[in-house]
Amino acid sequence: MLAAKVQLYDFFAATVDIFGDMPFSKACTLPLTNDVNGSYAPYDKAEDIYRTILGELKEIAPRFRLVTVPKNFSTQDFINLGNMEKWERYANSLRLRLAMRVATQGALQEEGRAAIKEMLENPAGYPLVEEQENNIFIINQKSGQLNFTAGSGLGDWTTNRLASGAIIDRMLSHGNYDMNSSDPQSGVYIKGEDDPRILLNYNPVSITNRQTGQVDEHRYLGTDLTVADELTEYYNAQAQDEVNTANKGFSQITQRGFFWENDKFDMLIMASPEIHFLKAESYEMGYGVAKNEAKAEEEFKKAVSQSITLYYYYDSVSTGENARRYNAPTAEETASFAAAKWNSTEYAD
């Protein structure tokens, strides 16, 4: 019952984020009362739902240390396979996630910051998802209800798998490919300087540069609404995918590689990089805890490093023909990139 509550609250909080006020405290009574008229539940305020969930998670998490685990629970539990420590970390981490959402403004600001303070100042009492082995996920069963091979649907919706120029701008120091640019490195990935996750996400393209007459190879070309229609049409017609040669146009999400159609890709519910990003923001902004630039930097670097490691882990276990095309960055290279991102002022909004 405790595990079911955690999963329910995770789902419900996400639903509240989308829709706001919802039936909650008096919802789903029909199976219990058989009263149709009484089953039309009133709407609870979003703030009240969040307040309830934050309080419940605080109460639930430590109980996983004391609960007697039923013999058959490990086979019934398709999330954590009966691991009570992971359920405790899941509950605490979900509470941190939700507390951060309300810590900046609104009626629950004080409650959110108090929860953050309580957890971050007592890590032994409130263990979090902080390492890859703590990640919360459902294993892809490849058949039945738990068959969710990553990227299902991308094959039917071409525009949904095109790279975004804005994302590429953030991942490459020389930005999204621009044929009109005087920068010869436009759209080029530079090892040791750029985000190595782009190699697993998107296919590079080759295209004849109308300005120089030369073929620009290994370029990352994302969609950009600010580009003139005529040039967009040229990109669509002339850019050649270097991985899937049947594709023309903008860089696309890599198929049968790290993510799309990788049947080894788990359904991630909560991953350690997110928790370190949340902690970094807490220390940087002083949400619940005293501002601490050194701790914020440490947590940010952990988040970036662990994210890169996670990407390359799923690439390494993929059985697709487009997986493992690139060597994973070394720990030193990953740390250097994370440090460069922390020190960058390019996107200091």
Describe each PLM feature range.
Residues 234-235, 322, 337:
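Long, compositionally biased, charged low-complexity segments
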Residues 1-315, 345-348:
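Structured, solvent-exposed acidic/aromatic patches
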Residues 302-334:
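Conserved small-residue
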Residues 333-349:
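Acidic, glycine-rich loop-and-strand cores that form catalytic or ligand-binding grooves
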